[in-house]
Swiss-Prot record:
GO terms for molecular function: G-protein alpha-subunit binding; guanyl-nucleotide exchange factor activity; protein folding chaperone. The gene is RIC8A. One of its GO terms (biological process) is G protein-coupled receptor signaling pathway. One of its GO terms (cellular component) is plasma membrane. It comes from Macaca fascicularis (Crab-eating macaque). Pfam families: Ric8. This is Chaperone Ric-8A.
Length: 530
């Protein structure tokens, strides 16, 4: 049914005509998410009529039908203006039972009406900055969190819970003030951690089900997304013991999340949200990933249960198969694994054994191949600076931040970016809490070590001598041509001669020489003025 015909039916004021038209329109457009521009004015007219009835009060027996029509029209970004008035948003909040006003909805609201209203609010908040502002000013987050807090005591339909959480996610994703309000004033981390525990159905023994059902998976992912939003910028610093205990408890739940599968094909997506949130936890709280007691079926290394680390490594390998949005795909899990390896020697040694096993193939470039090491080394020269930074940092930590070891496994050419950023081009080792791990060389590596090109990280075939057969005069002529070309490139600033500063940073050759001379003068007692 066309929107013009529906608008004309609404204008008749006859209930049976209106209901027939709305039901027909709703059924026809239940799955419509794109709309014909030619009918845009008709849809706006219909939206204004619906808003007029919405603000005056929907007929109690047909609220769901009216709200379904509002929901369909709220998908059209060109028809949002009528719905984004303060009165309209307040009316929808009342029907969703999340308004602060009194007496708008009965004590036991119709859950179908609540659900449709929540869907309308989600559409409006997603697409309209005005709706986002009005929702924040109306403090809808307060009533939403109150209802979320009742999930343990009262039974709510899955869809109502899901859209409660979806609306929370949208508000916290789009409004900084709502994020801060939920984190600080409403104690959102505690509330949502408790809700996550309830959703995962963790038993008193601390064991969730082996397979998370579909509905629980959907709700858990929304909870994880809201928690990610409110912790993103809030807990980067030191936390007190009470907060640390809360984040460790959240960490144990996230540990469960990365260890279980979900019904359907959403396991990797579910694990991704859990890993993203792990990256927001205080670093000292990540120790919960290694506190599982070893058991018969667990992966044990140096007396520590490595099941979670192995699960994260498997997740990383899956994400490395993706070719788009690598930053969002691999950076979070690499960051978590890096911090675990940095702080816990057993985790570092286990990961090194899996990612950087003793070198045997010394004739292939480190970035060539399908082993995990090869894929990570390839990322070290990725166009996205964040991707190459986290990949290099992970491998560097697995090498106990030893420059020679790092170059051995990645090649100097691949390692140069991180070494330059760290001021380690001249070698050395940064300060770190690392024991002197042994790095066992294979017989193949020992035999070929002297022939390995440190830049490429492999044994290179000896190239033919390009000057073979030339006279000394010809060699001198070619050398002068090369000097002239370099001089021209340098004068035109196409290239710039570089040198190593005393602090290990790449800098212009002139600056490097000046710094070196200054350092020599400052350390020479005879250079003091008379």
């Amino acid at each position: 049914m066309e929107p013009r015909a529906v608008a004309e039916a609404v204008e008749t004021g006859k209930e049976d005509v209106i209901m027939e038209a709305l039901r027909s329109y709703n059924q026809e457009h239940s799955q419509s998410f794109t709309f014909d521009d030619a009918q845009q004015e008709d849809r706006k007219r219909l939206a204004e009529l619906l808003v007029s009835v919405l603000e005056q009060g929907l007929p109690p027996s047909h609220r769901v039908t009216w709200l379904q029509s509002v929901r369909i029209l709220s998908r059209d970004r060109n028809c949002l203006d009528p719905f984004t008035s303060r009165q309209s948003l307040q009316a929808l909040a009342c029907y969703a039972d999340i308004s602060g006003s009194e007496g708008s909805v009965p004590d036991s609201p119709d859950m179908d009406v609540v659900l449709e209203s929540l869907k309308c609010l989600c559409n409006l908040v997603l697409s309209s900055p005005v709706a986002q502002m009005l929702a924040a000013e109306a403090r809808l987050v307060v009533k939403l969190t109150e209802r979320v807090g009742l999930y343990r005591e009262r039974s709510f339909p899955h869809d109502v819970q899901f859209f409660d959480l979806r609306l929370l996610f949208l508000l916290t994703a789009l409004r900084t003030d709502v994020r801060q309000q939920l984190f600080q004033e409403l104690k959102g981390v505690h509330l949502l951690t408790d809700t996550l525990e309830l959703t995962l159905a963790v038993t008193p023994e601390g064991n969730p089900p082996k397979l998370l059902p579909s509905q629980e998976t959907e709700r858990a992912m929304e909870i994880l997304k809201v928690l990610f939003n409110i912790t993103l910028d809030s807990i980067k610093g030191e936390v007190d013991e009470e907060d640390a205990a809360l984040y460790r408890h959240l960490g144990t739940l996230l540990r469960h999340c990365v260890m279980i599968a979900t019904a359907g094909d959403r396991t990797e997506e579910f694990h991704g949200h859990a890993v993203n949130l792990l990256g927001n936890l205080p670093l000292k709280c990540l120790d919960v990933l290694l506190t599982l007691e070893p058991h018969e079926d667990s992966v044990e290394f140096m007396g520590v249960n490595m099941d979670v680390i192995r699960a994260l490594l498997i997740f990383l390998e899956k994400r490395l198969h993706q070719t788009h949005r690598l930053k969002e795909s691999v950076a979070p899990v690499l960051s978590v694994l890096t911090e675990c390896a940095r702080m816990h020697r057993p985790a570092r040694k286990f990961l090194k054994a899996q990612v950087l096993p003793p070198l045997r193939d010394v004739r292939t470039r480190p970035e060539v191949g399908e082993m995990l090491r090869n894929k990570l080394v390839r990322l070290m020269t990725h166009l996205d600076t964040d991707v190459k930074r986290v990949a290099a940092e992970f491998l560097f930590v697995l090498c106990s931040e030893s420059v020679p070891r790092f170059i051995k496994y990645t090649g100097y050419g691949n390692a140069a970016g991180l070494l330059a950023a760290r001021g380690l081009m001249a070698g050395g080792r940064p300060e770190g809490q690392y024991s002197e791990d042994e790095d066992t060389d294979t017989d193949e590596y020992k035999e070929a070590k002297a022939s390995i090109n440190p830049v490429t990280g492999r044994v290179e075939e000896k190239p033919p001598n390009p000057m073979e057969g030339m006279t000394e005069e010809q060699k001198e002529h070619e050398a002068m041509k090369l000097v002239t070309m370099f001089d021209k490139l340098s004068r035109n600033r196409v290239i710039q001669p570089m040198g190593m500063s005393p602090r290990g940073h790449l800098t212009s050759l002139q600056d490097a020489m000046c710094e070196t001379m200054e350092q020599q003068l400052s350390s020479d007692p005879d250079s003091d003025p008379d």
